[in-house]
Amino acid sequence: MRNTILFGVSMILLANFCFGIMSAFVKITADYFSPMENVFYRSITMTLLLLLIYPFKPYRLKSYKQGGFKKLAFRVVVGGLAMLAFFYNIEKISLATATAFSQCAPIYTVLLSPFLLKEKLKRSALISACIGLVGVVLISDPSVENVGPVEIFMGILSGIFVSLAYITLRDLREYYDKQAVILAFAFGMSLLGLVGMFIDIPFLSTGIHIPRKEDILWISLIGISGTLGQYFLTYAYMNAPAGIIAPIEYTRIVWGLLFGLYLGDTFLDLKSSLGVALILCSGLLIALPALLKELKKI
């Protein structure tokens, strides 16, 4: 049991590192590619890698039972919108702040679950979510770096859409193999990104820019790191309880800060640092009951 949990913890740490470095590569390419193009290149590379792996490690592609396609399509759309909003913010604001906005998903999950899942909202969870919302307000300061109304809106959207994707994943386990969900997400986002590149969308899609020689490396690294991150994330939740894994996911903000500083981001000021700290505390408090419950079983 302990070895399995240790393996799961190792996997989530690796996943967060991979997602962190993927975000750094996206920031590097953001000077040339639009957020929509980065979504497409990230997704199509991931799709090709998954198709190459499939013959060596096949899995069930068909659903276990009927009724899951709409849920899968919804997961693709909200997951794609979350990625698009996140990639936009990576281009415009510091990597740490963009990541912090995205990592607010558990806060929104707590607030949305009573309406979408008919779950009872506990007072402790509500207080924790409110602490996180204060953190969101603190990092949503227009006087800090380039955080304007559009960036704040995109940041909040990225967190909400990630939370909706997580909520949907709970149901999808009854219909599809985990690997099939990953492949469907990658393929669906490739299609959405491809179509989106031909549509002029302010801030998000500014036409098609043909990849230069030096861009091929970055595009490949974005796809590889994103694919590895998704695989490590899947294996983490397969081998260890979610109550133990979820709090560790917040190390992604640390990687966002470190990689951002390396790429030239300025260090967060006191107000933004406090906001990120409150978001971290909020997420940990939300996950604490499940974490303690799982630790007692060890």
Task: State each model region's role.
Residues 34-48, 88-105, 148-161, 212-226, ...:
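Structural signature of hydrophobic alpha-helical transmembrane segments
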Residues 41, 99-104, 172-188, 230-261:
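Helix-helix packing/entry segments at the starts of transmembrane helices
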Residues 105-127, 254-273:
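C-terminal transmembrane-helix exit sites in multi-pass transporters
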Residues 1-14, 47-74, 123, 187, ...:
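Membrane-interface interhelical linkers
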Residues 4-7, 40, 64-68, 141-160, ...:
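Juxtamembrane helix-entry segments on the extracytoplasmic side of multipass membrane proteins
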Residues 24-27, 35, 50, 145-205, ...:
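Transmembrane alpha-helical segments that form core, pore/gating elements
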Residues 16-24, 51, 76-84, 106-111, ...:
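Hydrophobic/small/kink-forming positions within alpha-helical transmembrane segments
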Residues 124-141, 271-290:
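Hydrophobic transmembrane alpha-helices of multi-pass small-molecule transport proteins
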